[in-house]
Structure formats: C-alpha cells, structure tokens
From Swiss-Prot:
GO terms for biological process: cytochrome complex assembly. Its main location: membrane. One of its GO terms (molecular function) is ATP binding. It is a peripheral membrane protein. Part of the ABC transporter complex CcmAB involved in the biogenesis of c-type cytochromes; once thought to export heme, this seems not to be the case, but its exact role is uncertain. Responsible for energy coupling to the transport system. This is Cytochrome c biogenesis ATP-binding export protein CcmA. InterPro entries: AAA+_ATPase, ABC_transporter-like_ATP-bd, ABC_transporter-like_CS, ABC_transptr_haem_export_CcmA, P-loop_NTPase. The complex is composed of two ATP-binding proteins (CcmA) and two transmembrane proteins (CcmB).
Length: 205
C-alpha cells in the first residue's frame, strides 16, 4: 500500500497543493487530474522520492520511503517526461540492459514481444538516436511489458500514442492491477470511461 499524508508542495512561493492525503492499495488504477500548473508532475516526482516536499509523509508497505529506499525502488517503475533510454544503444539493447539491471527474465522473445506491442517491430536494431522522439518514448514504454515491479508511476504515458496504442496500454494497465499491481498516471486523454477500475485524484480544486 502507498500512503500519502499531509503532503504540501510549494514552488516559487506558490502553493501547488497542501495537506494532500490518499491511500492506494494493490489492484488500484489511479489517474491524477488537474489543469496545467497544478502540480501533477511534481506530485509524481515527490511520491517516487525524486522531488522535495515541504511537508508530509510518504509510506510504502507501512515504511517511510526514506527508510526503505532499496525495497521501494525494487518495487517501483517510474516513467517520467525524460525517456531514460540510452541513445547510443539500439531499441533491443536498451531493453536488454533494462532486464539486466532489474533481474528480469532475459529472454529475447519477451523483448521482441514488448517492441511489437509498442509498434516498433522491425526497428529493434536501430540506434535510439536515429528514432523519432515518439519512437524513443515507445522504447521506454516497452519496459512495462518486461517489468516485475508492483508499483508503476507514469507521467503522461499516452503522449504521442495513437488510438490503437492507447487501447493496448489500457489493456496492459488493467492486467497489471488485476494481478495485484498499482498504476498511478497522469494523462490528458480520456481513459477507461466509466470503468470501476479507475479512480481519480484531482489537484487544483
């Protein structure tokens, strides 16, 4: 379980949010909503431990994330605005590298499957530097198919993804929460209309 209590973030003397409280349990899909500038990305970065908070506490499995940093990071997959892919490596090599550092199943078949799911079949051996920005984003998203982490925190994962790609990702998110995972994301696109699986947390009200 992820617990956020009395969370406050102030940037440039402007309060983005204060005394924010919520709990997210395994099997939940949560969308963070709000206008631009309300602190959605800031919230995700704070929850992952990458951003500073002014007040409040964040716990994972009952422990403050500062005290259980190693376990928390083992359980976390974060995809932010930066893709985090290595431009000098190919798409395939990037995912192989990801497998090696996360002790994932190292089968080549899983990598090919992941790249197919994000529409990069046939581009496996192309250096990432030669891919478009949207394709580089898809290489990063392909990690989701290789992930064993429980907690997925995703900042605008649907950017530059077509309708079919959105459906594929929605199915992946559903399967992840059905298997006891947690997905927290921001997006400007409509998702899971009226789905009981989707819970929304709105910032800026």
């Amino acid at each position: 379980m992820l617990e956020v209590s009395n969370l406050t973030a102030i940037r440039d003397e402007r309060v983005l949010f204060e005394n924010l409280q919520f709990e997210i349990k395994p099997g939940e899909l949560v969308q963070i909503e709000g206008r631009n500038g309300t602190g959605k990305t800031t919230l995700l970065r704070i929850v992952t431990g990458l951003g500073d908070r002014d007040e409040g506490a964040i716990k994972w499995k009952g422990e403050a994330i500062e005290k259980s940093r190693d376990q928390f990071h083992q359980d976390l997959l974060f995809l932010g605005h930066q893709t985090g892919v290595k431009r000098e490596l190919t798409a395939f090599e990037n995912l192989r590298f990801y497998q090696s550092i996360h002790n994932s199943d190292s089968s080549s078949e899983r990598i090919f499957h992941a790249l197919t799911q994000v529409g990069l079949a046939g581009r496996e051996d192309v250096p990432v530097a030669q891919l478009s920005a949207g394709q580089q984003r898809r290489v990063a998203l392909a990690r989701l198919w290789l992930s064993h982490q429980i907690l997925w925190i995703l900042d605008e994962p649907l950017t530059a993804i077509d309708k079919q790609g959105v459906k594929v990702l929605e199915s992946l998110f559903s399967n992840h929460v059905d298997n006891g995972g947690i997905v927290i994301l921001t997006t400007h696109q409509d998702m899971f209309t009226d789905s009981p699986k989707l819970r929304k947390i709105k910032l800026g009200d």
